[in-house]
Amino acid sequence: MALDYAKEQIRVMAICPGAFNTPLLRNSMAGDIEEGFKAMGDAHPIGRIGQPDEIGNAASFLCSDKASFITGEYLVIDGGMMALSLIHI
């Protein structure tokens, strides 16, 4: 898609989020939510789950002129989980 629209100066990117503190995640958890978030965070290399504003900050950057040469990219925002999985390949 990025190649299809590049000549029109339309940039195409995707944000691929990991575990984030959202109502969807909260509603899917049983038991103590904060305890669950801590356990999930401990599994992440960065030591916590993400906050919604971190996705917003990335989206704002990608939509800005500062990212004007970026197209056809996937931005993984997952606290290092993908990097962790690559260690085991």
Describe the residue ranges of each PLM region.
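Conserved SDR Rossmann-fold cofactor-binding beta-strand/turn motif
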Residues: R11-P17, N21, C63, V76-D78
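A glycine/serine/threonine-rich, flexible loop-to-helix segment
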Residues: K7, A19-A43, L84-I87
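Short C-terminal tail/terminal secondary-structure segment
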Residues: S60, T71-I87
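A conserved structural motif in NAD(P)-dependent oxidoreductases
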Residues: H44-I55, K66
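Short, small/polar-rich loop/turn modules that mediate ligand/substrate recognition or access, typified
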Residues: A6, R11, I70-G72
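A short hydrophobic alpha-helix cap/turn motif
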Residues: L3-K7, F20, G50, C63
